[in-house]
Swiss-Prot record:
The lineage of its organism: Bacteria, Pseudomonadati, Pseudomonadota, Gammaproteobacteria, Alteromonadales. Signal peptide: none annotated. Binds 1 zinc ion per subunit. One of its GO terms (molecular function) is zinc ion binding. Disulfide bonds: none annotated. NCBIfam families: alaS. It comes from the Bacteria. One of its GO terms (cellular component) is cytosol. InterPro entries: aa-tRNA-synth_II/BPL/LPL, Ala-tRNA-lgiase_IIc, Ala-tRNA-ligase_IIc_anticod-bd, Ala-tRNA-synth_IIc_core, Ala-tRNA-synth_IIc_N, Ala-tRNA_ligase, Ala_tRNA_ligase_euk/bac, DHHA1_dom. GO terms for biological process: alanyl-tRNA aminoacylation; negative regulation of DNA-templated transcription. It comes from Shewanella sp. (strain MR-7). The gene is alaS. This is Alanine--tRNA ligase. Belongs to the class-II aminoacyl-tRNA synthetase family.
């Protein structure tokens, strides 16, 4: 019973569902609306605003099977993955949560009941820990649950600071925190290790399987602990650890999920030793990489994308170590989908894009991997001591794409340490890229906090009376503001849409007798809408009743652009494929910008098809239907969700005929015909696997078409024709240009042949070899190659160096006859000269080219060439 990981997941969720908990889907690995986190790393992340009192849900009890990643940032397990039994970059955290509902006693009882009655773990194999001062938890365990006092261990501050304890949980430097109690499983005395709190606690005998956090405080940047609005509960149980216990194995890598992935990786690569640690690394890394791509992260050189790149490249390196000779990593995705079962639904939906992203990154890295490993191997073989210098580490990073932890991984296998300080010094000028991943450490509490709620009436009304409930000046709450003040006004109800889902906030005015507040933007602050702007007349106090007036023209134009993004999204999926998902958008009154997943430039014919499809739906004049429904019902209807957004149990669904259905809280037109016209203005790539379309609608689209028509008419006039003949006349002109270029090249070749005859006479003989060093005047840089070829034919055994200085630049070419390349190499010759004229270059031993930016140094540089050649011909 409950032998498979999938069965355990189902049993856990069903147990808590039957105890009054709402089963909530795993949130994205990219945390929504939380600047303090790089990745979702705990089950409670998606409920952080609920714990802080900034968000409300329709339920007070929840249970989840949350996908988590710990790699990069503060929570980073990457270096240990593959070398220990329980470290992973990706794991599933089973959790149950109480938002001001039950507290310590029920939380403890739920955990104990599930482990001992549902899973039937022997009670004698379990012991628990509590925070040193948490007498309440101790008493519950001892008196209510019946755990003997000797099996309840108090853990104090053991990490060098107040509240720095294994039994005091905090997500970061700020945010929700509180004491916790943990349940440990004893694997038996045949495994080394001691109970928690003992000198041998780091052994593998006693393993933590359940952690219950009593969420009582919100830690400020100052260190102050403020009580949360309602005491809450956050629990977590790693599914991999409990699966190992239920399946009778000690290492997480021996459970069903990992056995299947390891076996498949071994089959693809051709490995027979299934205990190889590199297979463990690969099996772990495919989980984090595949789910990260599925959640919208693409390999890049900054932020989350760079962490993903590091993980992929570490896996590829381990595959290379096992003998992989071609792309293998992406081939594990189907097996991953199969073994993850219901937890892989989102991954299955994006399988095509995930496989393409992983394959593209693997193939890109493969081009430099072998050479980089060769350089690293040589450096390690020549190393005296046990430390690899930072310069070599930087070279591998900068030239061959080796993340530092990949180099450290190789060094670790040979008991070599990496000079990280030296590496940091070497890449100081490029640190901005690598530091992007650290920019997620912003103080979550630094943003303006508004403890109020604003009702939104702007779906149906653009004007309405409202009462001022709060005023903020320079980030501080104030009772009143005066004319000229830039402030934030909070109302009890508003028709102003607050920026969300890519749609910009409304503009307009708030007015009363003698009072006018010009709203330049509307933003969300928790449950409140903040109207940002300037008081242009009068004075304004909390409690004042105003008339709120949205700028109707701006709202209308914004609605055109928002509604058409839904049509565009659906059209892209029809034309390019269902792997297309929205990665972001910007909708304002002037234009729309739509980012989406796709692995190549959209072909002109495809763009035309998308545009025509959208305009067809506009002409069909579909009525936009809006409905409130449960999120599960919306998903069953096929509603598309917006990337990065968080959704409650009840959602708003916008439908346009049978063409588009999306979850959306934004404002829209009444019918698609209101959009009038849709015109794409640009398409391009913004990141690996992410494309961007910019477009206009309505009057802006008409103006764009008129501008294009005017340019076409101007071109027709220049070509002395009409708009119908522009293409034909351009083809004629292009054909003429091609013929002129051909004629010109033939003339240049004749001139080069004539010039070479004259130049050949300037050669000097050095040890029986013709040497020609010449600065040329009136010769185009493009003619150097042909001239050099002519001279080599005439001079036979020769070394040639020609230079041209024009328009502030230097062009160089070196040629060496085949009989001399053993003594003089053209690449070395041209590089020597280029270095003296502010440039660089290279090429083959018999021919090489270079450029420079210091023509004033060319004469001096050429004067050194003859001695340099003479020395090598001696």
């Amino acid at each position: 019973m409950y032998q498979t990981t999938a069965a355990l997941r189902s049993a856990f969720l069903e147990f808590f569902r039957s105890n009054g908990h709402q089963v909530v889907d795993s949130s994205s690995l990219v945390p929504g609306n939380d600047p303090t986190l790089l990745f979702t790393n705990a089950g409670m992340n998606q409920f952080k605003d609920v714990f802080l009192g900034m968000d409300k849900r329709s339920y007070t009890r929840a249970t989840t099977a949350q996908r988590c990643v710990r790699a990069g940032g503060k929570h980073n397990d990457l270096d240990n993955v593959g070398y220990t039994a329980r470290h992973h970059t990706f794991f599933e955290m089973l959790g149950n949560f109480s938002f001001g509902d039950y507290f310590k006693e029920d939380a403890i009882r739920f955990g104990w009941t599930f482990l001992t009655e549902v899973l039937k773990l022997p009670k004698e194999r379990l012991c628990v820990t509590v925070y040193q001062t948490d007498d309440e938890a101790f008493e519950i365990w001892n008196k209510k649950i019946g755990v003997a006092a000797e099996n309840i261990i108090r853990i104090g501050d053991n990490k060098g600071a107040p509240y720095a304890s294994d039994n005091f949980w905090q997500m970061g430097d700020t945010g929700p925190c509180g004491p916790c109690t943990e349940i440990f499983y004893d694997h038996g005395d045949h495994i080394w290790g001691g109970r928690p709190g003992s000198p041998e606690e780091d052994g593998d005998r006693f393993i933590e399987i359940w952690n219950i956090v009593f969420m009582q405080y919100n830690r400020q940047a100052s260190g102050e602990m403020l009580p949360l609005p309602k005491p809450s509960v956050d629990t977590g149980m790693g599914i991999e650890r409990i699966a190992a216990i239920m399946q009778g194995v000690h290492s997480n890598y021996e459970i069903d999920i990992f056995r299947a992935l390891i076996a498949k990786a071994a089959e693809i690569i051709g490995v027979t030793d299934l205990s190889n640690k590199s297979l463990r690394v690969i099996a772990d890394h495919i989980r984090s990489c595949a789910f990260l791509v599925a959640d919208g992260v693409m390999p890049s050189n900054e932020g989350r994308g760079y962490v993903l790149r590091r993980i992929i490249r570490r896996a590829v390196r381990h595959g290379n170590k096992l003998g992989a000779t071609e792309a293998f990593f992406y081939k594990l995705v189907p097996t991953l989908i199969e073994v993850m079962g219901d937890a892989a639904k989102g991954l299955a939906d994006t399988q095509v894009i995930v496989e393409k992203a992983l394959k593209a990154e693997e193939e890109q890295f493969a081009r430099t991997l072998e050479r980089g490993l060769g350089i690293l191997d040589s450096a390690l073989n020549e190393l005296q001591g046990d430390t690899l210098d930072g310069e070599t580490v930087f070279k591998l990073y900068d030239t061959y794409g080796f993340p530092v932890d990949l180099t450290a991984d190789v060094c670790r296998e040979r008991n070599i340490i990496v000079d990280e300080a030296g590496f940091e010094a070497a890449m100081a000028e490029q640190r901005s890229r690598a530091q992007a991943a650290g920019n997620f450490g912003a103080d979550y509490n630094a943003a303006l906090k508004i403890d109020a709620e604003t009702a939104f009436c702007g779906y149906s009304e653009l004007t309405g009376n409202a009462k001022v409930t709060a005023l903020y000046l320079n980030g501080e709450s104030v009772p009143a503001i005066n004319a000229g003040d830039d402030a934030v006004v909070v109302l009890d109800v508003t028709p102003f849409y607050a920026e969300s889902g890519g749609q910009v906030g409304d503009k307009g005015v708030l007015v009363a007798q003698g009072i006018e507040f010009a709203v330049s933007d509307t933003q969300k602050f928790g449950q409140a809408s903040g109207h940002k702007g300037t008081l242009t007349a009068g004075s304004l106090s909390v409690g004042q009743v105003l008339e709120a007036k949205v700028d109707k023209k701006l709202r209308h134009r914004t609605q055109l652009n928002h509604s058409v993004t839904h049509l565009l999204h659906a059209a892209l999926r029809q034309v390019l494929g269902t792997h297309v998902t929205q990665k972001g958008s910007l909708v304002d009154p002037e234009r729309l910008r739509f980012d989406f997943s796709h692995f190549e430039a959209v072909k002109p014919a495809e763009l035309k098809q998308v545009e025509e499809l959208v305009n067809t739906q506009i002409r069909r004049n579909h009525e936009l239907k809006v409905a409130e429904m449960a999120i599960d019902e919306a998903k069953e209807k096929g509603a598309m969700a917006l990337f990065g957004e968080k959704y409650d149990a009840q959602v708003r669904v916008v439908t346009m005929g049978d063409f588009s259905i999306e979850l959306c809280g934004g404002t829209h037109v009444g019918r698609t015909g209101d959009i009038g016209l849709f015109k794409i203005t640009s398409e391009g790539g913004i990141a690996a696997g992410v494309r961007r379309i910019e477009a206009v609608t309505g009057a802006a689209a008409m103006a764009y078409v008129a501008q294009q028509q005017a340019q076409l008419e101007e071109a027709a006039a220049l070509l002395k024709g009409d708009t119908q003949s522009v293409v034909a006349k351009l083809k004629v002109q292009l054909d003429k240009m091609k013929q002129l270029e051909k004629d010109m090249q033939q003339l240049k070749d004749k001139l080069a042949a004539a010039a070479s005859a004259d130049l050949a006479g300037d050669a000097v003989v050095v040890n029986g070899v013709n040497v020609l060093i010449k600065k040329l005047e009136g010769v185009e840089a493009g003619a150097l190659r042909g001239l050099q070829d002519e001279l080599k034919q005439k001079l036979k055994s020769a070394v040639i160096l020609l230079g041209v200085a024009q328009e502030g630049k230097v062009n160089l070419i070196a040629g060496v006859s085949n009989d001399l390349v053993g003594k003089v190499k053209a690449g070395e010759l041209v590089a020597m000269v280029a270095a003296q004229v502010g440039g660089k270059g290279g090429g083959r031993p018999d021919m090489a080219q270079a450029g420079g930016s210091q023509p004033e140094n060319l004469d001096a540089a050429l004067s050194q060439v003859l001695p340099w050649i003479t020395e090598r011909l001696a």
